[in-house]
């Protein structure tokens, strides 16, 4: 392909772990261990951020902050955030491999991209320790990117563009407009926008929908429709140039962006 040079994927909810389920149980279990229960919906709110800022965002929620204050006699501070993070990470590592199934269609799309000489990068809110549990299984299922940039590899995570800026040179791409960021979270879409790439939101397979594949298929058509529309609206509100149900639907978008670049358009 002449104009599109790279596609940069998120991991959980985008290429693996349909519904982005792996971190949810770990967050809920961790806060419960500290005597401050949180809900799945609360846990999902900051999804896409690095995990320590994610925990900080959860602890800044008024209800959670008040519950913490009631439990410990003071508002949550940096030491508390560190304590929760230190308990969370081993839990997330322990479950990560169990949620490394590649989402249907991803391997075929990766093959199609490579057939068009498009390089494949990835960024993630996961640490390298967590990714070490995921990458081998994903590779065995047909998804093995050219670049992986993790939380901790750059000075800041999402929504800053630093992981994009690190990924592009690793892929040999220097014009951000020639890259596409694909992500299932609002903060991941913002990462792409801030980095100057095209952005594609993933609505059904990821965090914005937040359900396992089997549960999605079991939904009544009207419930599926309103949940899908709500997910689309979230991603569009974050600034996504396109929204697709899953990565399986990506190639027509890539061809459309190729045509737009050929006409001189920019993200």
From Swiss-Prot:
One of its GO terms (molecular function) is magnesium ion binding. One of its GO terms (biological process) is organic phosphonate catabolic process. This is Phosphonoacetaldehyde hydrolase. It is an enzyme of class 3 (hydrolase). It comes from Paraburkholderia xenovorans (strain LB400). The lineage of its organism: Bacteria, Pseudomonadati, Pseudomonadota, Betaproteobacteria, Burkholderiales. It comes from the Bacteria. Belongs to the HAD-like hydrolase superfamily. PhnX family. The active site is at residues 10, 51.
């Amino acid at each position: 392909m002449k104009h599109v040079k790279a596609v940069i994927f998120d991991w959980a909810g985008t290429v693996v772990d349909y519904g982005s389920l792996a971190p949810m149980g770990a967050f809920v279990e961790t806060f419960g261990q500290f005597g401050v229960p949180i809900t799945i919906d609360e846990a999902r709110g900051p999804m896409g951020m690095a995990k320590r800022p994610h925990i900080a965002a959860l602890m800044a929620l008024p209800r959670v902050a008040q519950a913490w204050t009631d439990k410990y006699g003071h508002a949550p501070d940096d030491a508390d955030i560190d304590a929760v993070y230190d308990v969370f990470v081993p839990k997330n590592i322990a479950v990560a491999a169990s949620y490394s199934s590649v989402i249907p269609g991803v391997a075929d799309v990766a093959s199609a991209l490579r057939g068009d000489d498009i390089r494949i990068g990835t960024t993630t809110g996961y640490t390298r320790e967590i990714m070490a549990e995921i990458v081998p299984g994903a590779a065995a299922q047909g998804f093995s990117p050219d670049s992986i940039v993790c939380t901790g590899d750059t000075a800041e995570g999402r929504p800053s563009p630093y992981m994009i800026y690190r990924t592009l040179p690793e892929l040999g791409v220097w014009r951000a407009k020639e890259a596409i960021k694909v992500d299932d979270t609002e903060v991941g879409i913002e990462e792409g926008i801030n980095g100057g790439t095209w952005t594609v939101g993933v609505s059904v397979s990821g965090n914005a929908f937040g359900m396992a594949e089997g549960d999605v298929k079991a939904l009544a058509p009207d419930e599926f429709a309103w949940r899908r529309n709500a997910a689309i609206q979230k991603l569009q509100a974050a600034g996504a140039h396109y929204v697709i149900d899953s990565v399986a639907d990506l190639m027509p978008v890539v061809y459309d962006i190729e045509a737009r670049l050929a006409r001189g358009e920019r993200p």
